[in-house]
Curated annotation (Swiss-Prot):
PANTHER family: REGULATORY PROTEIN SSL2874-RELATED (PTHR38449:SF1), REGULATORY PROTEIN TM_1690-RELATED (PTHR38449)
Transmembrane segments: none
Top-rank lineage group of the source organism: Bacteria
Cystine bridges: none
InterPro entries (alphabetical): RemA-like
Lineage: Bacteria, Bacillati, Bacillota, Clostridia, Eubacteriales
The organism of origin for this protein: Heliobacterium modesticaldum (strain ATCC 51547 / Ice1)
Family: Belongs to the RemA family.
Name of this protein: Putative regulatory protein Helmi_20580
């Protein structure tokens, strides 16, 4: 099994296979998800004190805050997947 890791900013890395959603933090429902995760102790703040620009939701119900734009994280995720699929084609 090949573990794919995604850089979410400032040297913080998340397992790509565990990501369920990458969303923007502006909407009220996402703010509610963040607060509920904070209350449950399932919030991981990887912003280094900067503005939250992306909220990453994992399959373990952890909520990760990132200072990187959601589009950037999604691009890194899709780039990793295309590289991985390219490796399979050559095997």
């Amino acid at each position: 099994m090949d573990i794919k890791l995604i850089n979410i900013g400032f040297g913080n890395i998340v397992s790509a296979s565990r990501i369920v959603a990458i969303v923007s933090p502006e909407s009220a429902p996402i703010k509610r998800i963040i607060q509920e995760a904070r209350d449950r102790g399932m919030l991981i703040d990887a912003t280094y004190g900067r503005r939250t620009r992306a909220v990453i939701i994992t399959d373990s119900d952890h909520v990760i805050l990132s200072a990187v734009q959601p589009e950037t994280v999604a691009h890194r995720l899709s780039a990793k997947e295309s590289v991985h699929h390219g490796d399979e084609a050559t095997e």
